[in-house]
UniProtKB/Swiss-Prot annotation:
Native organism: Neurospora crassa (strain ATCC 24698 / 74-OR23-1A / CBS 708.71 / DSM 1257 / FGSC 987)
Family to which this protein belongs: Belongs to the PPP phosphatase family. PP-2A subfamily.
Cofactor info, note text: Binds 2 manganese ions per subunit.
EC number(s) stated in the UniProt entry for this protein: 3.1.3.16
GO BP: any one term: mitotic cell cycle
Binding positions (Mn(2+) 1): D75, H77, D103
Pfam families with a match to the protein in the record: Metallophos
Class of this enzyme: hydrolase
PANTHER family: SERINE/THREONINE-PROTEIN PHOSPHATASE PP2A-RELATED
Modified residues (Leucine methyl ester): L327
Stated name of the protein: Serine/threonine-protein phosphatase PP2A catalytic subunit
Positions bound to Mn(2+) 2: D103, N135, H185, H259
Coiled-coil regions listed: none
């Protein structure tokens, strides 16, 4: 079959919304300005935004190529004001190229504003920002951990939740920086040996309960060798022998991932084959951790920038208490 592996896993062009008028740059800039001030968009504007974003994302690969320099970020989890701090530390978009590794929603109080802003930036500067899918970019998880309830509270119905969760199906699963640094939300899978295995996946679906797509968003590195059962109930744990072999076989120097709270914002593991980056400081407004982002320059040299929570007077009360289990 004469198919380029780069194109496998993409959505056919005929699925593009044909009756959608392209959003003008002044309109987008107005939306972004409003969102930067933590003001939510009207429901109809969110619908237009998500339709346009789908057109952009459906052309991206399951292993989206990214060029240096770029700044790599971990979980945000609706902590909007800390995202503003991240941009203050790392530079504004599009002055800085960004790669976000998923988990934009749930837990924090401003999931709506956070994910809307990142999606708007993606449409406005598609070659300057890459947004990957995390395990929380899912219909099932967001109904339990806050995003669904927040949408109901802020819009009075579930339409905005549906627009975004439908869009999440189009997010790339992984990214590859200059063919050397492999970025994804969770970790490796026993079903995947090569990047071409990932390119061959059909990603346009809800995150499955098991299988390679699930594993990429749920797995974690572990001190024990080989594959292990994950305490999360999805994905696997994988040892240094697994990450070393994967990096060697695919010509990689590093796996960068998010998904786990690390107290200093970043953490090397598995003899520096893997680095975990977490970008939500004082996670859930109580964990006391620092956050970090990883700056990669044009020579593939990386620097970690750590930051603390943005000072703020207080946060609004949430309508229900979310479960304690940290996903």
């Amino acid at each position: 079959m004469d198919t380029n592996m780069e194109d496998v896993g993409r959505v056919p062009a005929e699925l593009t919304s044909s009756n959608f008028e392209p959003t003008t740059i002044p309109t987008l800039d107005g939306w972004i300005e409003s969102l930067m001030n933590c003001k939510q968009l009207a429901e109809s504007d969110v619908q237009r935004l998500c339709e346009k974003a789908r057109e952009v994302l459906q052309d991206e690969s399951n292993v989206q190529p990214v060029k240096c320099p770029v700044t790599v970020c971990g979980d945000i989890h609706g902590q909007f004001h800390d995202l503003m701090e991240l941009f203050k530390i790392g530079g504004s978009c599009p002055d800085t190229n960004y790669l976000f590794m998923g988990d934009y929603v749930d837990r924090g109080y401003y999931s709506v504003e956070t994910v809307t802003l990142l999606v708007a930036l993606k449409i406005r500067y598609p070659n300057r920002i890459t947004i990957l899918r995390g395990n929380h970019e899912s219909r099932q998880i967001t109904q339990v951990y806050g995003f669904y309830d927040e949408c109901l509270r802020k819009y009075g119905n579930a339409n905005v939740w549906k627009y975004f969760t439908d869009l999440f199906d189009y997010l790339p699963l992984t990214a590859l920086i200059d063919n050397q640094i492999f970025c994804l939300h969770g970790g490796l899978s026993p079903s995947i040996d090569t990047l071409d295995n990932i390119r061959a996946l059909d990603r346009i679906q809800e995150v499955p309960h098991e299988g390679p797509m699930c594993d990429l968003l749920w797995s974690d590195p572990d001190d024990r060798c080989g594959w292990g059962i994950s305490p999360r109930g999805a994905g696997y744990t994988f040892g240094q022998d697994i990450s070393e072999a994967f990096n060697h076989n695919n010509g990689l120097t590093l796996i960068a991932r998010a998904h786990q709270l690390v107290m200093e914002g970043y953490n090397w593991s598995q003899d520096r084959n893997v680095v975990t980056i977490f970008s939500a400081p004082n996670y859930c407004y109580r964990c006391g951790n620092q956050a970090a982002i990883m700056e990669i320059d044009e020579h593939l040299k990386y620097t970690f920038l750590q930051f603390d929570p943005c000072p703020r007077a207080g946060e609004p009360m949430v309508s229900r208490r979310t479960p304690d289990y940290f996903l």
